[in-house]
Amino acid sequence: MPFELSVSLTTLGILAVVAFVAGFIDAIAGGGGLLTTPALLTAGMPPHLVLGTNKLSSTFGSATAGFTFYRRKLFHPRQWTHALICTAIGALVGAVVAHYLPAEWLNKMLPVIVFGCGLYLLFGGTPKAPLDVDVPIRKKWQSPQGFTLGFYDGVAGPGTGAFWTVSTLLLYPIDLVKASGVARSMNFVSNAAALMVFVINGQVDWLIGLCMGACVMIGAFFGARTAIGGGAKFIRPVFISVVLALTVRLAWQHWFGQA
């Protein structure tokens, strides 16, 4: 029996609520997979379907959030063409490599790296006010940044939004709100590219993924608008809270062998 036919309406409702909350949080600070992946596993979905199904729903959310930032003129694709292209390439390569490469060493390093991102945003000197929109964005770092983070998202995924936000703040003269717009947009590119590989390999539960995707979209819409309206003062504490939760979750899972 297909998995979706064995899911009760109550379970489906719970997954929908989790997806909405995940979309809201992910649009602000990333880390939505921290909620949706365990929820799918708890619902009894076979592990080989969880990653692909989660990518499907995440793609809807990152598309909605990214487009919201774009419409508010907080993300300009023409300034980021190198990053967009290399992110897509990296995600495709990463998703393919994920089928053959043991990721145990990477998993054990993740909590430390993610926690480092949180510490940087907590103590680092990030811009407090919006910067000039016409400041040129250097192309020099876009290709390596895009390929590296796209590859990582294809291979693993947790913390990708945090990595995008912090690395963008470090490399370019933009504020936290615009860095969040870049992160959400690049997340969409890597999600969509990696999703193609999961679809080809038949690792997506379409019914569950589309239902959750719709709820993630709604959550992402409100989350992105909240982030833009609240600015850096709102994003910073939410981002740090999500990073700390993600650190605990990853450490528990990969250091202590707990699900």
List the model feature ranges, each with a label.
Residues 12, 55, 110-114, 118, ...:
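Residues within membrane-spanning alpha-helices of integral membrane proteins
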Residues 52-105, 191-241:
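Selective hydrophobic functional segments
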Residues 16, 20, 24, 55, ...:
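Residue-level signature of the transmembrane alpha-helical core
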Residues 77-86, 109-110, 133-139, 180-186, ...:
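Cytoplasmic-side transmembrane-helix entry/capping segments in multi-pass membrane proteins
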